[in-house]
C-alpha cells in the first residue's frame, strides 16, 4: 500500500530542497519493498499568493487532511513583505486546521565532524542532544489581539488552557520514555511574571507527578534557559518542553549550535506517535533563503525531516534510521554545501545521500 504524501514546496529554496527529499525517498522505494510513496504537489506561501491570492489554497488544505503525512519546504520572502496577505499566514493556518499541536525540533550533531563549525567552543558543544517540544496551535500567536489603528496602541494576548498543556506534556513524556533510561524533561516558562506560565508550570508538574512519576522534571525560566543554551547546552539534554512563543525563540537559538540552519529538521504532530503512524507535517527549521543563489542551499534539514516522517508517521523506522546514517556518512566523506565549508551543490548532496541510503538498505 502506497503512502500518500502531500508535498508543499513553498517559496525560493523550499522548492529545491523538497526535490532532494523526494529524491531520497524515491531511492528508498527502489530497494525497500514496504516503502512505496504517492506524492501530490500543492502550493503554499508566496507561490500560492501569486497563483491564487491565498497563502493556503483550499485544495492544498483538503489534500493535506487526506494525506498520511505532509512535507513542507519553506515559505516567505521579501517580495511579499508584511502586507495584509502574507506567506506565513499559510503556515499558521495549516498548523491550526490540522491540529498540529506538538512541534518537535531535535538539536544534535548529525556528525561529530561538524563540531568545529559550531559558534560554541567544541568542548561546550560536544554531546549536545535534546529535542524541543513546542506547543504549536495556542498561546500568543493565536490569542486575541489589537492592531495599532492610529491611536498608538496595540496588544497581543497569551492564553493557555489546562488540556492544551496536558497533551503537550504527555507528548514530551512519551518521547522521554522511548529511551532507557528515560530522558529528563526541562519545562521552560516565565512563571515568576506571567499568569499563563504559572498555569503551565502547575499543569506540567501535576501531569508528570500523576501520570509519569518515573520521569525527572526540571523547571527553568526561559531567560535562564537561553543563557544555559549558549554557555553549556548539554545541561538541557533530554526533552525541552515549552510554549509556542518561547519554543519559537529557543529552538531558533538552538538551531545555530550545530553550525548551520541547514542541518536541523522538525516534525509537527497531531497525536502521539505511539504506533509510528501519527499524522504530521515535516519541514526544515530554516526559512526560504531568498538571498541564496540556486543550487547553494543545504538540503540536509529537509532530508532529515523526511527521515522523521518515515519514523513517526509512516511506520518505516528502519528506513528513517538509514537516512540518518546516510547523512552522517556523506558529511564525514566531505560532501557538503557552502554553509558547511564545502563546495557541493544542493543536488550533489542529495545525490550522495540517495546513493548512500540505497547501499545501506540493499
UniProtKB/Swiss-Prot annotation:
Q: Which GO terms describe its molecular function?
A: 3-isopropylmalate dehydrogenase activity; magnesium ion binding; NAD binding
GO terms for biological process? L-leucine biosynthetic process
- Specify the enzyme's EC class, one word: oxidoreductase
Q: Which cofactor does it need?
A: Mg(2+); Mn(2+)
**Which residues take part in binding Mg(2+)?**
223, 248, 252
Site keyed Important for catalysis: positions: 141, 190
Q: Which domain of life is it from?
A: Eukaryota
Cellular component terms, GO, for this chain's entry? cytosol
Gene3D superfamilies recorded: Isopropylmalate Dehydrogenase
Q: What is its EC number?
A: 1.1.1.85
What remark does the entry make about the cofactor? Binds 1 Mg(2+) or Mn(2+) ion per subunit.
Q: Entry's PANTHER family?
A: 3-ISOPROPYLMALATE DEHYDROGENASE
Q: How does it assemble?
A: Homodimer.
**Biological role stated in the UniProt entry:** Catalyzes the oxidation of 3-carboxy-2-hydroxy-4-methylpentanoate (3-isopropylmalate) to 3-carboxy-4-methyl-2-oxopentanoate. The product decarboxylates to 4-methyl-2 oxopentanoate.
What protein name is recorded for this chain? 3-isopropylmalate dehydrogenase
Originating organism: Zygosaccharomyces rouxii (strain ATCC 2623 / CBS 732 / NBRC 1130 / NCYC 568 / NRRL Y-229)
Gene it is expressed from: LEU2
